[in-house]
Structure formats: C-alpha cells, structure tokens
C-alpha cells in the first residue's frame, strides 16, 4: 500500500513541508482495517467464511443477524482500493514506471510472500493447537504441507490484487505516458467505473462468485472487478490532480448508495424467499443484470461517499492516531496470526461464542495495531511495511 508520507496532492494543495502525511488517509486505513479485524472475529464465532480457529454459535438468530454485516463487508475494502489508486498516480508522477514497479514489488510483493509461507502457516498451526489437535509445527511446511491446508493468500488477497493492478498501471503508463483524465468529468468517470465493475463482475461471477473460497490460493477472484474499477477511479483522480473531483459529490453519492443498497437488499430477500438466490450470479437474465448493476453502483457510490466523509470529518491527527496510521499496513498483514492467537488464548475460558466474540474483538483490534507498530521498529522493516 502506498505511503501517505508522499506528497500526493495537487500543486495548489501541496503541504508546506515535503513528505507531510495525509492524516485523513491514515485515519481511513485505521478504521477500515479495524473493521476487517472485527469482521474476521465475527466469522469465527457467529458464522460466515471459515477462519483458522472457529467456535461457532448454534443460534440461528445470531447467524441471521450477522448477514447484514457480511453484506457490508463486500464493500468494506473499496475505499482502500480507491485511495491506493490515488496514491499510485501521484507516486508515479514523481518517478519512472520501472522505479514505481520495483517499489510496489517491495512493499506489496515481499509481505505477500512472507504471509503465504510464514504468517498463514503459523496462524493455521495456532488454530489447530486451539482445537487440541497437538500439531507438529514442521508439518505446516512442505510440498504440499502435511497440515494446515495448501499455501494460500487468504486475507491478503487484497494485497495480491493491489500488486497486480499497480504493475498493470505501471506497464500502461510506460507504454502510454500521457494521462487522459482531464477528458472526463467526475460524474462521467464514476458512471464509467460503476459500469466497468458491473460488466466485469457479471463475467467473473459466471465462474467465481463473491466469497468463493475454492479459487486458486483463495485469491477471491469474484472481488477483483470491484477492486480494479475503484483502483482505476483513484488513478483517474490522482492524474486529474485532486480527489475533490470525486468527493465533491459525496452527499449525493451517499443517498445513491443508500437507495441502491435498499434495492439490492430487497432483491436478495426476494431471491432467497423464492429459492433462486444462486440465479442472480449465473447466466444472462434480468436478475443477473440487475444484481451486477446495483453492485457496481453501490461499489462506487459508497466508496466515494465514505472517502469524502473521512476527508471532511476525520482529517486530524494525534500521537496515538499517527502511530496507528503508520502501523495500519503492518497490522493488516499480521492480523491473521495475532487474531488467531487471541482466540486460542480465550478458548480455555469456555464462554458462550457470542460473548467470546465481543471480548476477542475488543482485545484483538489494539493488539493487531500494537504488533504492527512493534514490527515496524525492526530496522529496515519500515521500508516495506
């Protein structure tokens, strides 16, 4: 993820001191990553996708109540893709494509490899340990591993996607260095991004649905169209000079997102009750087209509205917030093993899953950021994380 320490604003917005951090971007990352940790805690205790350690509730009421949170999680990482695209455009404007690509390989590729071959393995080991399976640590490495399942990117599919988009962007600008962002207005480019997400998602979902855990290395291909569209939208804003071309429409987009989300929820309820929920992801019928169109609209409208809200309402910084902002990327990379360790530590208390969820979430969020901050104090690590 690009560093907000870079000068990434339009000429008339350049801060007085070079290298000044964009505090609103730090705050946005802290909030989104904290939500990711809480969501992954919920999947272990309340339902949803699989986690390294699970102690699921048997209450259908809690599982049903968790569904809206799962629906929101579909759009949770959108702001990070948008901001990453914006940072990438401003960064590439100050360095050649080769240098930009090398920096992305260092800051995204290296953590991804460490996660796949170290962090994910340790999290799987801790999860099995929490289930009293008495695992042997060495069995979690090998070709293939004897324990812990195959190697996978897991929760770092976001980093894998961002690395792919960043390298593709560098290649594009090397072949065609002159940006064309000024030819489009903000509403036009947002409409184009929503349409791009809708079309590519419709094609991708024919093979891989949202949250499909059976993809290669759990890459979550069904999520990539949204990420690509929002990254491209951020790039456009960066090349145009300022995010204001998008965020100025924040209030209207908030209402647009709410309206589209209401229609999307109504469609989901209708399909669920009629037993045709799967039909909204396959084929070329009107249900599929309506589903992907609403998905594209919500992806863009919610992301830009949320980003505008953070920029307007939460742009300040204090000592604790600044440290959390600097540690946010490391916290995201490490949260799988930290969160699983906390879950295993509380497993012996034999509490109700619902209560354990609340306790673990409260403890794990600050611990993940603390682990990220501590890791960055190791010499050389801050250049990567």
Residue ranges and their predicted role:
Residues 2-385:
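Alpha-helical transmembrane segments and their immediate juxtamembrane cytosolic regions
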């Amino acid at each position: 993820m690009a560093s907000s320490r870079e000068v990434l604003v339009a000429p008339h917005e350049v801060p007085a001191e070079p290298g000044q951090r964009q505090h609103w971007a730090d705050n946005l990352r802290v909030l989104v990553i904290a939500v990711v940790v809480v969501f992954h805690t919920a999947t272990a205790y309340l339902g949803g996708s699989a986690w390294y350690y699970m102690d699921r509730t048997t209450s259908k009421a809690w599982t049903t109540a968790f569904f809206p949170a799962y629906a929101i999680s579909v759009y949770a990482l959108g702001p990070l893709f948008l901001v990453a695209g914006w940072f990438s455009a401003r960064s590439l404007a100050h360095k050649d494509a080769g240098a930009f690509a090398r920096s992305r390989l260092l800051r995204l590729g290296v953590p991804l490899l460490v996660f796949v071959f170290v962090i994910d393995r340790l999290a799987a080991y801790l999860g099995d340990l929490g289930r009293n399976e008495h695992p042997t640590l060495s069995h979690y490495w090998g070709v293939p591993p004897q324990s812990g399942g195959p190697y996978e990117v897991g929760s770092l599919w976001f980093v894998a996607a961002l690395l792919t988009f960043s390298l593709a962007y560098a290649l594009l600008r090397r072949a065609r260095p002159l940006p064309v962002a000024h030819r489009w207005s903000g509403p036009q480019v947002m409409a184009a991004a929503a349409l791009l997400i809708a079309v590519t998602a419709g094609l991708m979902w024919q093979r891989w649905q949202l949250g499909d855990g059976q993809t290669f290395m759990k890459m979550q291909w069904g999520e990539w169209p949204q990420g690509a569209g929002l990254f491209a939208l951020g790039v456009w804003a960066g090349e145009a000079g300022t995010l204001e071309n998008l965020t100025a429409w924040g209030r209207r987009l908030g209402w647009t997102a709410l309206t589209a989300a209401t229609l999307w929820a109504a469609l989901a309820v209708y399909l669920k009750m009629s037993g045709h929920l799967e039909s909204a992801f396959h084929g070329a019928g009107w249900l599929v087209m309506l589903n992907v169109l609403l998905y594209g609209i919500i992806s863009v409208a919610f992301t830009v509205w949320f980003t505008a809200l953070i920029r307007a309402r939460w742009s300040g910084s204090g000592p604790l917030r600044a440290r959390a902002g600097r540690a946010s990327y490391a916290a995201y990379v490490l949260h799988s093993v930290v969160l699983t360790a906390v879950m295993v530590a509380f497993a012996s208390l034999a509490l109700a899953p619902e209560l354990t969820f609340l306790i673990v979430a409260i403890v794990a969020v600050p611990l993940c950021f603390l682990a990220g901050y501590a890791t960055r104090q190791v010499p050389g690590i801050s250049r990567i994380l």
